[in-house]
Each structure stands twice: as C-alpha cells, then as structure tokens.
Design a protein with these regions (language model features):
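Short beta-strand/loop turn elements enriched in aromatics
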Residues: 18-19, 29-40, 94
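Well-ordered beta-strand positions in beta-sheet-rich domains
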Residues: 24, 59-61, 75-77
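Short, surface-exposed secondary-structure edge patches
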Residues: 34, 43, 58-61
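Short strand-coil-strand connectors
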Residues: 54-58, 81
Length: 94
C-alpha cells in the first residue's frame, strides 16, 4: 500500500488481504485522542499531513507514505499535526 495508488486500488487490495472495509479518515489540526482501543484490526497509509501514534512506550511520527498497523483491542493514542492528517485505513473486524 502506498500513496502512489488511488483509494480504489487501496480498497481492493485491502479486500484481497481479508479486510472487511476501507475508508478515508480525515482529522482536523491538533486533534488529540487519548489512549483508547478499537474493536477491529487496522492497516493504514498516511496520505496528507502528519500524526503521532503511541502504542505502549513507543511513539511514531507518521507522514505521507508512512504506514501503520494495529491489532484489535490494542490501547493506543493519536495526535495530529498543525495541518491535521488524512489516511486510508482498512479494517478487519475478525
């Protein structure tokens, strides 16, 4: 998955990989999401802006072209940069 593909290509690849859905998420500038979980696994690629993803003691800065994966029910926090961020995300509800 990379940003040189279009969203439809991302969505089709996600379905081939066994994900249930794919969508584009857009976050406003300086949004902060405290530690939380999701009832689904996620695989995403950042397409605009920047964000920081914290899992446990590790925080990663993510920019366009960077990818991340997180399993269901894993506690994590998200912080979005001064321009906000957009990413394409595939979700698997298992």
């Amino acid at each position: 998955m990379n940003t040189s593909t279009n969203f439809e290509s991302f969505r089709l690849q996600a379905l081939i990989e066994g994900f249930d859905e794919a969508l584009e998420r857009e976050w406003p500038p300086l949004t902060l999401l405290d530690m939380h979980t999701h009832p689904f696994a996620a695989k995403a690629v950042v397409t605009r802006g920047e964000m920081w993803l914290t899992v446990g003691d590790l925080t990663r800065q993510l920019r366009p072209g960077d990818t991340f994966e997180i399993e269901r029910d894993v506690p994590h926090a998200e912080r979005y940069g001064a321009e906000g961020a957009t990413y394409w995300v595939a979700r698997r509800k298992d």
